[in-house]
Amino acid sequence: VTSVSQALQGVMPGLNIDMNDKGGRLDYNPTMNIRGTGNLNTGSSASPLVLIDGAEGDINSLNPQDIANISVLKDAAASAIYGSRAPFGVILVTTKSGEAGKATIQYSNNFRWSRPTNIPDMLDSYRFAKYFNAAQKNSGSGTTFIFTDDTIDRIQKYMAGEYPYTSDPNGSQGNNFFPFNVASNDNQNWPRNFIDKTSFGQEHNLSISGGGEKVKYYLSGAFLSQDGQMNYSDESKKRYNISGKVTGQVTKWLSLDFNARFIRSDIEMPTFVKLYGDRFFAETTKLYPMMPLYDNNGHYTRNPKLMQLTSGGRSNSSKDTYFTSGGFHLTPLKGLGIHGQATLRTESYRHQYNVNKVYLYTRDNQPVEEAWLGGDPDLAAGKTFVQSQTQQTSMMTTSLYADYEYSWNKHNFKVTAGMNTEYYYINELIGKRYDVINENVPSINTATGTSDLKGSSKEWATMGYFARLNYDYEGRYLLEGNIRRDGTSRFRGNQRWGTFPSVSIGWNIAREAFWSPAEAYVNLLKLRFSYGSLGNQNTDNYYPTYSIQNITVGSVDAGGRWLLDLANKSNIASSPGLVSSLLTWERVTSYNAGLDFGAFNNRLNGYVEYYIRDTKDMVGPAEEITPLVGASAPKMNNTSLRTKGWELQLTWQDRIGKVGYHASFNLSDAQTEVTEYPNPDKTFYTKDGDGNTIENYWKGKKLGEIWGFKTVGIAKTDEEMQSWIAQHDQSKLPNVGNNIWKAGDIMYANLDDNPAIEKGTSATDPKDLTIIGNYTPRFRFGFSLGADYKGFDINLMFQGVAKRDVWVGGDDRTAYSKGMIFWGINGGQWDSTGYEEHMDYFRPEGDEMGANLNAYYPRPIIGSKQNQQVQSRYLQNAAYIRLKNIQIGYTLPKAWIQKANLEKVRLFFSGDNLWTGTKMSKNFDPELIYQNGMSYPLSYTLSCGINITL
């Protein structure tokens, strides 16, 4: 693994780590949440707070070898002391410190080789052509086929080694190009052509620690390098870490500590991946296998995607993070402690990418400028530009608190009170200039065209006061109460401050006298209950209660023109949207009940926990207002969620003679329901600010619901299909093309009184739609096994999801290409493909490819989605179990290494993502269901290394 979050996946219940729509790209990390969805992404964030040695930081930028401990606070009562930044939990990371004694030097390395976990194979060119021709015939086009008999004959001869050319050397297609798709005859596997490389990575770590009774120190440095998996172009990620920590006991009553870290991260990749990484497979999969890699002159065939990848430009980004922290600890009186800490974190981010001209070559070796994907005018044929971005951020935090401990008889008290402040500032500048004169040295200064420049500066601050009381009686009865008073710069006046209480109680039953007979078997049995409330000020707008008027430089492209001619206006001002001055804190309240237990002298340990979390007054959309107002409705505190869930963790550790072994298992589940949302009609979809159709919410909706049709089956004969549609009119379904229904088509269930099969627009009038599944991951689990014997050790880690439904076939809201990897033929000819799985499609008796009456897929149809409605038959079971890691190590006997003055030497071999069990379509990785399987793939990895201590 190359990040801490990857290593944490499946380790503890309730800490959910998922791959996002970026997949395995080098410039992204997995997403994290604690106990499921916290909000609806309608205006605020529900990410957990990550504290590294008491200060917020990026867990994925840390050197894993510097980490001493990671703990997770999940409920509001446990997180109360951390206030307004922690309503959705806290991840506490403690880095290593020095210990008194002689200096200890440690060195470790890791060399790894990675390949993609799942790249589906395309059909060979012959079957691909037959598959597409069958789909064209099914559309009702008669005898007009996509691939001619002559082309298919050349394909067969080429595959048999009887034809030497990948396309007809005398043929021509388009504007005097060699044949490049439907008229060519190569046999390529394009997904593997683009991304199927064994990539190399390495990691090196060096640390020294030690000290005396007064001063202790820890210093470390690390280097990580990881290459990408893409062919034809290089990708790389490099990270450099330097850290130091010093603690000093100045007097008996005063100690000081200082902590500093520097992190440098460099990422390089093709501009093509930076711009189109989210649709990478959507574009590469559209290439036909008969399309040659090279034309007869040795150039890349007319393939803009390949040219953009290899020569379209480069993206380079770097990020420098500086972190410093200083603290003191006073103990002026017995039981009294006074603690203070101040931290400063600054980040400097730089990113530059350039777009070069892309050329294709004719039969006569003449270059022709080609446009990039997407129709962006900035990426038109012949356009070049360079864009440079700089971003400076700084965060300053302070905390000061005192605690006092006092015991009287068997009563123990602890009182804590203090305050903390945070200040965050970000400044960003983006410059763009066209017409680069030297593509080998792209920069703003080596471009001569027009320039675009924009920038921004933003800031926010928080302040909080807190108090905590802890009480326990003989370790049997426990009580804790917290109160916080938090303020934020994001809200106005009376809405700026909020008060948030929490309380927890516990009963250690194993400490009771009546439990003594069972203590030899169960030595820990503790019940605990908690209630807590925290505020969330993490809105996606730093100034959510202020109207902002956009003023931009006018241009014809932006619509900034005068009425009577095309002259540019000097600038354009747009009216600001409405805002609510009453916008205030989201309130996150949790209820928690748990049981901790330990048995058999703590060989068996575990806990079980049940929780409810209410997220109230979330920032959401206001109800629609009349268009006469001339502005969008303001966001308000008008939505709420309730999450219910439970967690279980079990661990066992023991030794039998010289064999030590351990096992752990964790399981968790959570479901979230919308309890308040301004959508009384319960419409399925709405529009976002950019006009895109997105999922809508309503009161009573469970997050993750998948609405679709119930599938009756595939008609085996024309008579069966005609009999069905005579009673159940399916012509009103969206995107049915020529509305031709035959054997091999889907029969949809009629769920209402209307004889027509129709798609409703709301949960109040769904027509024939019903809930067919839920994409929320259910029953997340992880379990590990390990053993050691005479220096040998082995550890295995499994992780997975026991229940999850996903729909990866697209729908009528999305472009045809969204369902291409699942369906193959997916509407239009140029938004379709053919993989091995797609050959399991319905074919009647007498079909030249052989009959297949019990096929999985319906008959394919070019230009129609009639068989590809969201439906129960093709809902995918995305449950999976994955061997996340296996590691085998051997620690050399001390007798072998003492002469070299070595304390410990361990060799290891490791593998990541080596096996996956799932019932999902083989075209998909069950962890990458976003973008309908079109994300950058994950990788499986083999690695080896050594750990040395001296």
Region spans (language model):
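Short, small/polar-rich motifs associated with maturation and membrane association
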Residues: V1-S243, S255-D257, F323-T324, Y359, ...
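Extracellular/periplasmic, surface-exposed regions of secreted and cell-surface proteins
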Residues: A46-S47, K245-R264, Y300-V355, Q366-E369, ...
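Outer-membrane beta-barrel transmembrane strand signature
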Residues: I52, K157-S209, Y218-S220, L224, ...
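Extracytoplasmic gating/loop element in the C-terminal half of outer-membrane beta-barrel translocons
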Residues: L360-R363, W372, V801-R906
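Conserved small-residue
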Residues: Q106-N181, Y542-T545, N550-V556, R655-G773, ...
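Low-complexity intrinsically disordered tracts that form flexible linkers/tails across taxa
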Residues: I267-F280, Y677-T683, P844, K919
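Short Gly/aromatic-enriched secondary-structure transition segments
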Residues: M122-L123, V355-V358, G431-D435, P680, ...
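Glycine-rich phosphate/pyrophosphate-binding loops
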Residues: G14, K216, Y789-G809
